[in-house]
Amino acid sequence: MSTLGHQYDNSLVSNAFGFLRLPMNFQPYDSDADWVITGVPFDMATSGRAGGRHGPAAIRQVSTNLAWEHNRFPWNFDMRERLNVVDCGDLVYAFGDAREMSEKLQAHAEKLLAAGKRMLSFGGDHFVTLPLLRAHAKHFGKMALVHFDAHTDTYANGCEFDHGTMFYTAPKEGLIDPNHSVQIGIRTEFDIDNGFTVLDACQVNDRSVDDVIAQVKQIVGDMPVYLTFDIDCLDPAFAPGTGTPVIGGLTSDRAIKLVRGLKDLNIVGMDVVEVAPAYDQSEITALAAATLALEMLYIQAAKKGE
C-alpha cells in the first residue's frame, strides 16, 4: 500500500492524483508503461519571478478538466487506448541544492530510458531540461531540439544553474545539434552565431502553420528529437502565470496546431516548463500547459497507431 507523501528509494514522492487522472506508479522503471510523467518542482535557476516549483501541481490539478474527454477533438481515438501512460509523481531533492536536483533528475531519466520508457516532464523552471537532455543524449546520441519559447536560452553568462543558459551549454556538451534544431516563438535578444534556426514570433504568427511545420521538418530531418515547450512562448493574454512573460507571443490555438504538426518527427522526450501559478488568472496558464502536454501525448499515440 502506497502512502501519500512517502519518499521512496527512487527519489520520487506520490501525489493525490496523476496527470489526467492517469494511474500513479511510484516504481515506474519496472512498469509496462510506454510514457512516464515526472514532475520537477524546481525554480532555483529562475531570473525573473519565482514560483515554477508549483507548476507540476498546478498542471496536474487543472488536468482534471481534460480527463473526461476520451475521443478528444479533433482526434478520432482515445490516447489512453494506444499509449500506456503513468504518472510517477515529483522528483524529491534537498530544497536549496540545485546540483542534487540535477543529478537525481538525470539519474531518474537514465534509469527510465534504460528500461525502455519515454518521458514527459513538467517543470519547474527551464533549467530542468538540461539534465534531461544529458540523460537522453546518453541513450539516443546527439539530438535535434524543437524549442518553443519567448527566449533562446543561449546566454553565456557563466552561471552553472540558470534557466537562460541550457541551450548554450547543451551544444557544447554534444547533446544537441544546433544545425538541426529550431527555436519557435522567440521575441527577445538572441545571437545568430549559436547555429539554431530561430523562427521568431512575428513570422510564426504571420506565416501559415503548414509552412512553419514544413520548415521544422526540413531542419530536423530524421534525427531523434527532444521537444521542450516553455509556456512563455504563448502571449501573456493566454499564459500570464509564468516567470518572464513577453508580449507579442503565440496564441494557444496556434501553439496547439504547431504541436499537432510535429506528429511525424522522431520525438524521444518532451517537457512543458515555466508555469508559475501564483501569477496565473483563473488557471488559464496551467490549463494551456496541461492541454499542450495532452496534445504531445496524442501525437505519440497517433504515430503509434499508424
Curated annotation (Swiss-Prot):
Pathway: Amine and polyamine biosynthesis; putrescine biosynthesis via agmatine pathway; putrescine from agmatine: step 1/1. It comes from the Bacteria. Mn(2+) binds at H126, D149, H151, D153, D230, D232. Keywords: Hydrolase, Manganese, Metal-binding, Polyamine biosynthesis, Putrescine biosynthesis, Spermidine biosynthesis. It catalyses: agmatine + H2O = urea + putrescine. Its EC number is 3.5.3.11. CDD domains: Agmatinase_PAH (cd11592). The keyword tRNA processing does not apply. One of its GO terms (molecular function) is manganese ion binding. The keyword Cytoplasm does not apply. Belongs to the arginase family. Agmatinase subfamily. Catalyzes the formation of putrescine from agmatine. NCBIfam families: agmatinase (TIGR01230), PRK02190.1 (NF002564). This is Agmatinase. It comes from Escherichia coli (strain 55989 / EAEC). The lineage of its organism: Bacteria, Pseudomonadati, Pseudomonadota, Gammaproteobacteria, Enterobacterales. The gene is speB.
